[in-house]
Each structure stands twice: as C-alpha cells, then as structure tokens.
C-alpha cells in the first residue's frame, strides 16, 4: 500500500499529507508486527545456546555499530530491490511468476546484506528482549532513522519517480 500511495502522490492523485499519514500508520503497524513476531520467536528458545542466537546477536550488534553512510547506502539499494520485487510481481501473469519475482527481489537484499527498516525492527526487538545481546535503544534508533531515510530515498528517487516519468511519456 505504501508504494502504491507514493506513486499516486507523485502523480498528484493523493495529497502528500495523506501519504505521510499512510507512511506513519504503515511504519507503526510494521513495528507492532515486528514486536509480536519477535516475541513469538523468543518463545522458541532458539536464542538459548543455538547458532541461530549467535547469528542474530552478532547481526544486531553489527547493525547498530555500522557507519552512517554504509547504512544509508545499503538501505537505498535494499528498497530498490524490494520495490522492484513488488512491481515485477505485479507485472507477472501467473501466481507462480508473482511468487518467484517476490522471492528473488527479497532474497537479493537479504543475501547482499542490505538494510531494511522493517526487517531491522524484528532483529532489534529480538536483540532487546535477549539479555545476551549488547544493543541499546539509542543504537536501535540510530539505525532505524538512517535506514528508514535510505529506504525512502531508494524507493522514491530510484524506483517510483523514474517509473512515473516513464509512464508520463506514454
């Protein structure tokens, strides 16, 4: 929904005020979903002496320790992958094609180590709930502020705006 309303805002069909309201509601809804998901994940016991726990702890610490420009650049590339995955999926004719395009786009950002604010919300909630993870609320806010800005820039400037300009010429 966020991507669609952004496209409609660029076209002038929806006010930017309404777009910002939708962004805020989506962001908070994603945060709530991340907290619930992390809470359920913590009930699995996978953080207790498991390789998964070690991986998640190390990833959370790395995410709050990364340099600002590194986070910003990774976030730009991440949302380019995510937006293209969604748009390519929309263009597919079959359900299998839609699913494969979505998986391909998301796996591209995951395997590349790019930064996505919503994915990070879940990582960080797990990290904050786990006493063995050395992250702070300040570190989480540092990451989410930079990554959210990079995700927005990547999606708006490098996907939505060019797509709008191409459509406008047709």
Regions inferred by a protein language model and the residue ranges of each:
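Alpha-helical transmembrane segments of multi-pass membrane proteins
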Residues: 21-29, 33, 146, 150
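Internal alpha-helical transmembrane segments of multi-pass membrane proteins
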Residues: 93-108
């Amino acid at each position: 929904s966020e991507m669609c309303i952004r496209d409609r805002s660029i076209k002038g069909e929806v006010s930017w005020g309404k777009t910002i309201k939708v962004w805020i509601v989506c962001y908070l809804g994603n945060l709530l979903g991340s907290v619930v998901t992390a809470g359920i994940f913590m009930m699995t016991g996978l953080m207790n002496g498991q390789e998964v726990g070690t991986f998640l702890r190390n990833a959370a610490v790395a995410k709050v320790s990364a340099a600002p420009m590194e986070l910003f650049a990774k976030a730009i590339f991440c949302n380019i992958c995510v937006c293209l995955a969604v748009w390519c999926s929309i263009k597919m004719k079959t359900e299998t094609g839609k699913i494969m395009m979505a998986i391909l786009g998301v796996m591209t950002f995951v395997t590349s180590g790019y930064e996505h604010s919503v994915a990070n919300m879940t990582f960080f909630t797990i990290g904050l709930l786990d006493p063995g993870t050395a992250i702070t609320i300040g570190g989480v806010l540092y990451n989410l502020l930079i990554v959210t800005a990079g995700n927005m820039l990547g999606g708006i400037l490098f996907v939505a705006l060019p797509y709008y300009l191409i459509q406008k010429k047709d």
